Amino acid sequence: HGWTNRRPEGHWMRLSAATLRAQGHHVWYPQFPDPDTPKPLEWQDLLRQESNMMDEVPGEEKICIAHSLGTTNWLYGALGDIFTEPFDRVLLVAPPDPQMTSEAEGIEGEPMDLSNPLLAPQAKKWAKSLTVIAGDNDRWLPRGVGIYEPALETEPLILPGAGHFSLDDGWGRWPGLISWIESGDPGDLLER
């Protein structure tokens, strides 16, 4: 999850975690420390620990769903080789524009360098399948999600009117996400 997120009731991530657990899936949905003033090393450490625990569940598909600043956290994890085993699928939802995160008060660390030539190879090393999705009206992506296409060498999906996929943007249940978990078809993510 992202900056200032405390896993609120009604948020699509929390609702999806509950739905998937009810269906019998193993779900990790940790609260990252200090969401108002995230410290990159602490977020990376928790991401590493949670990923390693996922590796302890044999025979299960390993899927990461990251939102907002959580997408930046996952990409830094991939760049830093903090994972033990690759993810079968990674979904980056509403990745923020690094220019915006660098200007936001309370977000520590260097902004993601989208020109880093290692970004795409490292992301592909740790994600067997990588999907990026964003809204066409995301306040955290004033230049549009297209800035991630050359950086990650993947064409992002655009969901019209999705905003930042937040409660403020009217995001609650996301049936398409549950469908994608089951099918693996990125097109399912466009279902609201």
Locate predicted features:
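Active-site catalytic motif of lipid deacylating hydrolases and related acyltransferases
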Residues: 1-60, 164
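Active-site nucleophile loop of the alpha/beta-hydrolase fold
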Residues: 2, 32-35, 90-100
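Catalytic histidine neighborhood in serine/cysteine hydrolases
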Residues: 24-28, 150-166
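Gly/Ala-rich beta-loop-alpha elbow adjacent to hydrolase catalytic centers
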Residues: 65-75
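Conserved hydrolase catalytic core segment
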Residues: 76-89, 98
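Short beta-strand/loop motif that positions the catalytic acidic residue
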Residues: 126-127, 131-134
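Conserved alpha/beta-hydrolase "acid-adjacent" motif
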Residues: 139-144
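Post-His helix in hydrolase/transferase enzymes
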Residues: 168-183
